[in-house]
Structures are given as structure tokens and as C-alpha cells.
Amino acid sequence: SSKYIQCAKLLSFPKKAEKICKSLSNKIKKKFKKIDLILAPAMGGIIIGYEIGKILKKETIFCERVNGKFILRRGFSIKKNSRVLIIEDVITTGKSSMECVKLIKKAKAKLIGFASIIDRSSKKSLKINQKIVSQFKINVPTYKKNKLPNYLKSIPITIPGSRFI
């Protein structure tokens, strides 16, 4: 895409992170009545997952990539039949979220939904079938490699947290 959204800078200010997460928590409470566990993908989801977990008084764990694949480490686990909410900082294609879904299914737990500070997905690019609760919805077009506009082709992809084309 022609735009990059970085939540790490916002989340580096504890009071701002707390304020954003309180507001998002209220939306989450309205949408999801029963949450047993919050799962956040590293790196971007760790701070928001922790803040939301603190506010909602829910256990929060994170998954991390090892050899390109999300796994649970550090003694984290997902209990069978638990109701799990996936929380990210930004959702674009939903690819990271769907990788988290695999961990939930493997544990025979139940995915209840997704939440993020920024939802910049579009129906065209989204791989998620469930509704996303977000603080902000931003419409930013994304492109497949073979459909990339000429003005973007010359710009190297060097943004932290992004997946390379």
C-alpha cells in the first residue's frame, strides 16, 4: 500500500496507550460477553493485548514466530473449550490473525472474534470472516505484487512489522 501505520510509537506513551485501550475495551465488552483468554501476536499485539487484558481482568498470552511460524512459548497454553479473543495493533490482510486462529483450533478452543486499534482491512484483502472490533477503521488500498502502481514499485519495503511482497 502507499500508507504505513505504526502503532508502536503511540503505544510507547503509557497514558496514551491506556486511554486508547480503555476506549477499545468498552467496545470489546459490548461485542463479546464472555472472554476467557486474550491472544496477541508478537510483536505488535503484545502491548495492546496486555493493556486490554489488564482492563478486562483477563489472562493475556502472546504467540511468537519461530522459523516463520507462530507458536506458543514461555509456558503459554490455550485451554480446551476456552473462548479466545485475538488482539492486534493493526489488521490489514488478517494473515497474522489467521495464523493465531490455527493455534486456537489446535487447542480445541473457540475463537470469539478479533480486536485492534486500527482496522485498515478491506473486504477485498481481508482473510477474516468475523467482525473486527476496532478503535479506528481506515480505508487504505492494498495491492498484489503484479498490480502495484508504478509510483510504488521503486520504493523499497523496509517497514518494521510488514510482510515483504
Predicted features, each with a name:
Residues 1-165:
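PRPP-associated nucleotide enzymes
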